[in-house]
From Swiss-Prot:
The protein kinase domain is predicted to be catalytically inactive. It comes from the Eukaryota. This is Probable inactive serine/threonine-protein kinase scy2. Belongs to the protein kinase superfamily. Ser/Thr protein kinase family. GO terms for molecular function: ATP binding; protein kinase activity. Residues 633-937, 964-1071, 1099-1125 are annotated as: Disordered. Residues 680-698, 705-726, 775-824, 877-937, 964-1012, 1023-1053, 1060-1071 have a biased composition (Low complexity). SUPFAM superfamilies: ARM repeat, Protein kinase-like (PK-like). ATP binds at residues 36-44, 64. InterPro entries: ARM-like, ARM-type_fold, CIK-Related_Protein, Kinase-like_dom_sf, Prot_kinase_dom. It comes from Dictyostelium discoideum. Residues 633-642, 664-678, 744-763, 841-858, 867-876 have a biased composition (Polar residues). Gene3D superfamilies: Leucine-rich Repeat Variant (1.25.10.10), Phosphorylase Kinase, domain 1 (3.30.200.20), Transferase(Phosphotransferase) domain 1 (1.10.510.10).
């Protein structure tokens, strides 16, 4: 009983131990993984050594698979395998497979470990051919599977691999003194770093003895049947226990003579090159030839095979260098050469092949050699295929990244390959972890920072968000305070894409202080400029509170410290960005106070000024729109409903009674003004003004081009409103848009939307003297047909009307009217006719245009917009029915042509000595005068406008004009009629021999209505020639009077216009009736000077209406001998 129990217990223990033995691996030091390859006898496992936790490949021979083999053959196989393992253990060379764990033998296994192996060359060749034949994707997710699939056997890769095999073979021949005798795809191993290693050293023998060290195993003793029965021709067989090399790769001398030479291994190399290049897809050789080996026999099969190989090599010599090599190595053994010559051949001397070979042996190179190599590699790295870069070059570079001496030349190559051929996942898993320690260094080298900043866009694209925040952001912030100015500038120039990853706290705490320090810390101007551009870049992502509290004060600090042009330009761009970010109120309070002084800086150029003004206008428009909306909404809820007020002055009613009454009395005039036109009369002081001063409505001529900027309003104590500052639209805009001051354009106003305002207009009273008798048979002062002359000239309105009676020359002037003539003035009867002005002054009324009967001077000084015109203007009448031949410097005849040119088309009669009565010309003793600018004509206070009129003789009046061409303005000028006034030195010398009136005015523009224009006797005031000048434009009628020979000239000019308040001269001429008796006043202004030629000629100098005024004589040519008086 007890014996039975003990037996059962032993059986249980024995069964347990047996089952455990089948589970536990007999190889105790390694963890086996998948099989990566299989030799004739060896299985190659991927494994990990337990003691060191290092990856390796384990070669395992399982004895149980050969239990059926005879004991003697099994012993021969085991002896052969031990020889191969021990030979590998004894040899150490980069091109020979390295053993990391020596061979061990147990009852069941023989194993040894080597460096990690991807596969044998035969396995890779089989994978490639299978992949080409298959239509199914056999890709693997593992790195090893990817490399196997990606192995394409391109020629550059083939050259590098063959060279490594030759290098190992040379080591065997010269150092180990061995012949390999078994070179084939089975004996070549590809490691995981894609290096080609030489193995299969079981058939090696001494070069001297040519015998294998294994006893009873000589290749010469092998018989042919062993290849046939054992299947040694390349395909495995059940009789795989026979130890034979591959027949296809044996040299011909062994097959025919059973001997090996020192260069016999070169034949095997040639045959290997043929298989990997020409016969890669198994199209060069007959695929059924190997199956005929038993039938043909070894010799016949081998001869047929070698003949096909040589023929295909010869046929492909023009296509590849590999075919040329095959023709040499597979030919006559006497022409094959030796191993050393082949290694030094041109087949391996191209730059790309040598580069790959250098990288394969990089561990044996010195640092100085590596520095030179990697510097040159950057220039040629992109010549390699993407596969070569990823699989052969990049891993070597990453393995050397820990070398601080060469890191700065390694990193550019890594970045170059990563940017072009590395996937995002591979970069995050392989590349970035390898270089992260370098990037996160506390004291990185400037070269490393420069490389990272240069490749920052690529890094942002391939890194994850977490990697960007942990690695890249600290690098950029540190580079802003970088070790050198070059790094700082490079950071500011290239790191802008990373700005979108800055959060609000980082911007306010880290970025803005750094940028401000760069702007005010004494750095070069190019760094300061880039720093300001960063402010512009960050504005859209900064909160308004940070802008107001931090950014704007820093910008003011920057502007106070530097105002160079490039800095100003960058600041303008920043303020422009701020104008799009902030609201109108913040812009008005914070941005405009900085921009307006910036626009006046002397360092900015024209384009910069335009940019500044554009920003200012945009800000003003934004602020205006917001403010208008705010006030409109406020008014909508707070203002009562507007009612009509009896005292409302939005309507102007002016009545004009055109009768023939010769009395001048205040008369109401009916006018209609647009909505936006408002006038507030202002009382001015005039010593010679009547008690009730008149007012004149003066619209501005139309403009053909948009003004460059809005008019600037001038502040004055007496001005309460400005009609031209209101927003106009439609036809009303013609009031402020004008191409020329003397335009004759008349627009037709709309018949609706009319407003009227009651304005008291007072006309001057007539002096209590007897009026002369005036004929009422004169033609109308203005033609009924409107003529529009929009030239670059000052278009004078001229009516050439012939009359036998005297006529009056009536004008509106921007001053109080005063008649100091001894003879009173009688206004002629007027007719209502269309106005012919430089712009339409129709205020929406359906009535006919009204023409006032008397001269009205407006007392309302208006603000000063800058009106501009592009042409010179002529004062006076250029149209003359009489042929006036004025032989002066620029004598031009204008015969019934309305030509007012920019140049010298004037009737110049400036220095004639024949009874010439000359008005004093405008002049300026300062830099301000009449100027020709860009559509601007204004009166500015600031300086007086003296007149230099020097009488050299009683017949000569020299006119000297000083004109500036900076801005069209009359500066602080008071115009007055200094007739018979001793205070202004304006004296009419009636005692001159020929009655020449000498007008000498030093401080004011003066005109005379009393002066004797006769030649030896006073004028008979039966005919009035009234010359009215306005703003250097004369609107006159050239009427030819052939009956009345006496002339009385009355010049009504600007008077008592006090411009000290800097008010704009914008009063528009309402109805300017001009008429003068053969008075040709031609003022031609050509920038930058003005030539003013005043000509007074009598119509009755010649009965045939020919006036010949010559500078050289004092003769009047009277063809009909008519009496002047």
């Amino acid at each position: 009983m007890d014996t039975t129990k003990s037996f059962n217990f032993k059986e249980k223990v024995r069964g347990f131990l047996g089952s455990a033995a089948s589970v536990i691996s007999p190889i105790k030091d390694h963890d086996l993984k998948e099989v990566v390859g299989q030799d004739k006898f060896w299985k190659i496992y991927q494994s990990t050594k337990k003691t060191t936790n290092t990856e390796c490949s384990l070669f395992v021979f399982e004895k149980k698979l050969y239990e059926k083999v005879s004991k003697s053959n099994l012993e021969n196989v085991i002896t052969f395998l031990k020889k191969e393992a021990t030979t590998l253990q004894r040899l150490r060379h980069p091109s020979i497979l390295q053993v990391v764990s020596v061979m061990e033998e147990t009852k069941t296994h023989i194993h040894f470990a080597t460096e990690p192996i991807l596969a044998t060359l035969e396995d890779l060749l089989g994978y490639y051919r299978q992949r080409k034949k298959s239509t199914v994707d056999q890709s693997s997710q593992s790195e090893e599977g990817y490399k196997k699939k990606d192995f394409t056997f391109e020629e550059l890769e083939l050259k590098a691999g063959i060279f490594q095999i030759l290098d190992g073979l040379l080591f065997l021949n010269q150092t180990a003194k061995l012949l390999h005798r078994n070179i084939s795809p089975e004996s070549i191993f590809i490691t995981k770093d894609l290096k080609w290693k030489l193995g299969g050293l079981g058939f090696t023998c001494s070069i001297e003895t040519k015998e294998p060290p294994i006893s009873n195993l000589s290749l010469q003793d092998l018989r042919e049947y062993q290849y046939i029965s054992g299947g040694g021709g390349g395909e495995s067989s059940n009789n795989s226990n026979y130890i034979l090399p591959q027949l296809d790769y044996l040299a011909p001398e062994f097959i025919s003579q059973r001997k090996f030479e020192t260069n016999s291994d070169l034949f095997s190399i040639g045959r290997l090159i043929f298989e990997l290049s020409i016969n890669l897809e198994q199209k060069a050789l007959d695929s059924h030839l190997i199956s005929q080996l038993p039938k043909l026999g070894v010799i016949s099969y081998y001869n047929t095979m070698i003949e096909q190989v040589r023929r295909q090599s010869t046929m492909n010599t023009q296509r590849s260098d590999s075919a040329k090599v095959c023709t040499i190595l597979l030919g006559d053994p006497m022409l094959r050469g030796d191993l050393e010559n082949f290694i030094r051949s041109s087949f391996f001397q191209d730059v790309l092949t040598k580069t790959l070979l250098y990288l394969a042996n990089i561990s044996q190179k010195e640092d100085e050699s590596k520095l030179q190599f990697f510097r040159g590699l950057l220039r040629i790295v992109q010549q390699f295929s993407p596969r070569i870069q990823n699989n052969y070059i990049l891993p070597v570079l990453l393995s050397e990244i820990s070398n601080d001496r060469i890191i700065y030349v390694l990193l550019p190559n890594i970045m170059s390959i990563s940017a072009n051929h590395v996937k995002k996942e591979t970069f995050q898993s392989k590349v970035l972890p390898a270089i992260s320690n370098i990037l996160q260094s506390k004291e990185p080298k400037p070269e490393v920072l420069s490389c990272v900043l240069e490749n920052l866009p690529m890094l942002l694209q391939k890194c994850s968000l977490d990697q960007i925040k942990k690695i890249l952001l600290p690098i950029c912030l540190g580079s802003m305070c970088g070790p050198t100015n070059e790094i700082i500038f490079q950071c500011l120039s290239t790191a802008q894409p990373i700005a979108k990853f800055f959060d609000t706290d980082m911007i306010s705490v880290a970025v803005i202080p750094r940028l401000t320090n760069l702007c005010v810390g004494g750095f070069p101007v190019h760094i300061r400029t880039k720093a300001i551009q960063w402010f512009t870049l960050l504005v859209p992502s900064i909160e308004k509170k940070i802008i107001v509290d931090s950014l704007l004060p820093n910008l003011e600090k920057i502007l106070a410290g530097d105002n160079s042009p490039v800095i100003l330009q960058s600041l303008v761009e920043t303020y422009e960005a701020l104008s799009k970010k902030l609201g109108g109120e913040l812009l008005a309070k914070s941005v405009l106070p900085a921009l307006i002084p910036l626009s006046s800086d002397k360092h900015i150029d024209l384009e910069q000024f335009k940019t500044v003004m554009k920003v200012i206008r945009d800000i003003l428009n934004t602020y205006e729109q917001e403010r208008i909306n705010e006030l409109s909404n406020l008014q909508r809820y707070t203002s009562p409903t507007p009612t009509k007020d009896e005292n409302d002055t939005s309507f102007i009613t002016v009545n004009n009674n055109n009768n023939n009454n010769n009395n001048i009395s205040p008369t109401p005039i009916n006018l209609t003004l647009p909505n936006s036109f408002g006038i507030t009369p202002i009382t001015t002081t005039a010593t010679t003004q009547p008690s009730s001063s008149p007012s004149m409505l003066f619209p501005q001529p139309p403009q053909t081009s948009q003004p460059s900027s809005s008019p600037l309003s001038s502040s004055s104590s007496g001005t309460t409103s400005n009609p031209f500052n209101s927003v106009l639209s439609g036809n009303n805009k013609a009031l402020i848009d004008s191409p020329d001051f003397g335009s004759t354009y008349i627009s037709q106003p709309p018949s609706t939307q009319q407003l009227s305002s009651n304005i008291s207009l007072t006309l001057p009273k007539s002096p209590p003297t007897t009026r002369p008798t005036v004929s009422n048979s004169s033609n109308s002062l203005f033609p009924t047909t409107n003529t529009t002359n929009n030239n670059n000239n000052n278009n004078n309105i001229n009516n050439n009307n012939s009359s036998n009676n005297g006529s009056n020359y009536n004008s509106f002037n921007n001053s109080s009217f005063q008649n100091n003539s001894n003879q009173p003035v009688q206004p002629p009867p007027q007719q209502q006719q269309p106005l012919s002005f430089n712009s339409s002054f129709d205020f929406g009324s359906n009535l006919q245009p009204i023409k006032p009967t008397n001269t009205i001077a407006a007392q309302t000084p208006l603000p000063q917009p800058k009106l501009s015109y592009n042409s010179s203007f002529d004062i006076g009448n250029s149209n003359n029915n009489n042929n006036n031949n004025n032989n002066n410097n620029n004598n031009n005849n204008n015969n019934n042509n309305n030509n007012n040119n920019n140049n010298n088309n004037n009737n110049n009669n400036n220095n004639n000595n024949n009874n010439l009565n000359s008005f004093s010309n405008f002049g300026n003793n300062s830099s301000n005068g009449m100027n020709n600018s860009n559509n601007n004509f204004a009166l500015n206070s600031g300086s007086t406008l003296p007149i230099k009129s020097t009488s050299t003789s009683k017949y000569d009046i020299n006119l000297e004009d000083h004109v500036n061409s900076s801005s069209n303005s009359f500066s602080n000028n008071s115009f007055s009629n200094n007739n018979n006034s001793s205070s202004n030195n304006n004296t009419n010398n009636n005692n001159n021999n020929n009655g020449v009136g000498n007008f000498n005015s030093s401080n004011s523009f003066s005109s005379s209505s009393q002066s004797n224009y006769g030649f030896d006797q006073p004028l008979n005031p039966t005919t009035n020639s009234n010359h009215n000048s306005y703003g250097n434009n004369n609107y006159g009628n050239n009427s030819n009077n052939n009956n009345n020979n006496n002339t009385n000239s009355m010049n009504s000019s600007f008077k008592n216009m006090d411009l000290n308040q800097n008010n704009s001269y914008n009063n528009t001429l309402n109805d300017f009736n001009s008429f003068h008796n053969n008075v040709n006043s031609s003022f031609n202004m050509n920038p930058p000077s003005i030539t003013k030629n005043v000509n007074f000629n009598s119509n009755n100098y010649n009965n045939n209406n020919n006036n010949n005024n010559n500078n050289n004589n004092n003769n009047y040519n009277n063809n009909n001998n008519s009496n002047f008086w």
